[in-house]
């Protein structure tokens, strides 16, 4: 059996059950483990709800239980500059961002990783549901977590080969109930703690109210694609492509009881387009353009790839053909896709392996750009 005691692993601990069990498993495997609590958002701000103080108490309790040193590190400035400013800029541009993807890329596997290296870390570890496989030549492949319902490779798709080489995902081979059971068997204080939901800096707070504190709302007209005025919208930033709720219109218009969905935006005219039917023509597209395209392993500057893709978290894979040129890609769908949303991540897979991904700029229907921004 290899001697892990000379290998230092710094664990990102959130105060939740997943990162608690991550630290526990590594400690049981004999590694030299240090726990780090990342404070990314100012919880004294009256506009944001964050349970950082309580979460840190949970980290302290677990670290004491399993016998590892721990520190709290403040990454609020890095988070604001690298994640939150991006989040606001995307909403200003009429897009729907995915801050979790950027948080992993810029904070958990950059700012945190850099800090861990100053502590003499050989690796960092997190409670993400993903796996890494290492080739003999040192190349690392990122694989889906075995728990399909919890697999988080979608959010990790922007990680680089260098970041992955320094990363461990001890929970990747486990399913969530198994993780909770391990926590209970070890008597960890976080064993029954509920999973966090929503974006970390908003917590359980009303998203609309939160966003309006940073971006002034600009109400405008809500219209059908054929020009019927359907009333007023509260501000384009509050709506995402394919959204059903919150429109304030029922099936009464024109006598058709089919539900209404957001089918488009016109940022220049401040118009929100709506249509009836889950598979409304305006929601369907046949290809997309992506930027900030990145692969977890070294790839040629220009190439074509047949693979599968996800366009949102927990969505079944879809067959695609990807034409890559630099950090941009055209992604052609084998079957038309619904509600491809600018700002969201498109993530590429080859079987179990997550190859990387990019950010969706535009969706196209038979060569014509969809009016999604």
Curated annotation (Swiss-Prot):
Reactions this protein catalyses: S-sulfanyl-L-cysteinyl-[protein] + uridine(34) in tRNA + AH2 + ATP = 2-thiouridine(34) in tRNA + L-cysteinyl-[protein] + A + AMP + diphosphate + H(+)
Disulfide bond residue pairs: 103-200
Site (Interaction with tRNA): 128, 344
Family listed: Belongs to the MnmA/TRMU family.
Known function: Catalyzes the 2-thiolation of uridine at the wobble position (U34) of tRNA, leading to the formation of s(2)U34.
Molecular function terms from GO: ATP binding; tRNA binding; tRNA-uridine 2-sulfurtransferase activity
Keyword Nucleotide-binding set for record: yes
UniProt organism field: Streptococcus pneumoniae serotype 2 (strain D39 / NCTC 7466)
GO CC terms, sorted: cytoplasm
Principal location listed in the UniProt entry: cytoplasm
UniProt region (Interaction with tRNA), positions on chain: 150-152, 312-313
Subcellular location as annotated: Cytoplasm
Region described as Interaction with target base in tRNA: 98-100
Residues binding ATP: 12-19, 38, 127
Top EC class of this enzyme: transferase
Gene Ontology biological process terms in this record: tRNA wobble position uridine thiolation
Protein EC: 2.8.1.13
Keyword line: ATP-binding, Cytoplasm, Disulfide bond, Nucleotide-binding, RNA-binding, Transferase, tRNA processing, tRNA-binding
Protein name from the UniProt record: tRNA-specific 2-thiouridylase MnmA
Active site: 103, 200
Keyword tRNA-binding included in the entry's annotation: yes
């Amino acid at each position: 059996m290899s001697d892990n005691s000379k290998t230092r692993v710094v664990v990102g601990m959130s105060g939740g059950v997943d990162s608690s069990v991550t630290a526990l498993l590594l400690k049981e495997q004999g590694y030299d483990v240090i726990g780090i609590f990342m404070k990314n958002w100012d919880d004294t701000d009256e506009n944001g709800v964050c349970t950082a103080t309580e979460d840190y108490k949970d980290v302290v309790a677990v670290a004491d239980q399993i016998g590892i040193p721990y520190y709290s590190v403040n990454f609020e400035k890095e988070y604001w500059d690298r994640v939150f400013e991006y989040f606001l800029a995307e909403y200003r541009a009429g897009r729907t961002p995915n801050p979790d993807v950027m948080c992993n890329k810029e904070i958990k596997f950059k700012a945190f990783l850099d800090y861990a290296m100053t502590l003499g870390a050989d690796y960092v570890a997190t409670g993400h549901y993903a796996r890494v496989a290492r080739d003999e030549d040192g190349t690392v492949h990122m694989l889906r977590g075995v728990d399909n319902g919890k697999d988080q490779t979608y959010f990790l798709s922007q990680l680089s080969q260098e970041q992955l080489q320094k990363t461990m995902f001890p929970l990747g081979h486990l399913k969530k109930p198994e993780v909770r059971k391990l926590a209970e068997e070890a008597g960890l204080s976080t064993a029954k703690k509920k999973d966090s939901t929503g974006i970390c800096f908003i917590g359980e707070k009303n998203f609309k109210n939160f966003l309006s504190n940073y971006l002034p709302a600009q109400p405008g007209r809500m219209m059908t694609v054929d020009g019927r005025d359907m009333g007023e919208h509260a501000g384009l930033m509050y709506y995402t492509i394919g959204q059903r709720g919150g429109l304030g219109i029922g099936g009464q218009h024109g006598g058709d009881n089919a539900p209404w969905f957001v089918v488009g935006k016109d940022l220049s005219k401040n118009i929100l387009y709506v249509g009836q039917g889950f598979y409304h023509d305006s929601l369907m597209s046949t290809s997309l353009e992506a930027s900030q395209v990145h692969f977890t392993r070294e790839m040629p500057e220009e190439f074509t790839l047949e693979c599968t893709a996800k366009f949102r978290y927990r969505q079944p894979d879809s067959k695609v053909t990807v034409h890559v040129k630099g950090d941009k890609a055209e992604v052609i769908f084998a079957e038309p896709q619904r509600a491809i949303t600018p700002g969201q991540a498109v993530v590429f897979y080859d079987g179990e392996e997550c190859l990387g991904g990019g950010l969706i700029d535009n969706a196209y229907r038979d060569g014509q750009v969809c009016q999604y921004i």
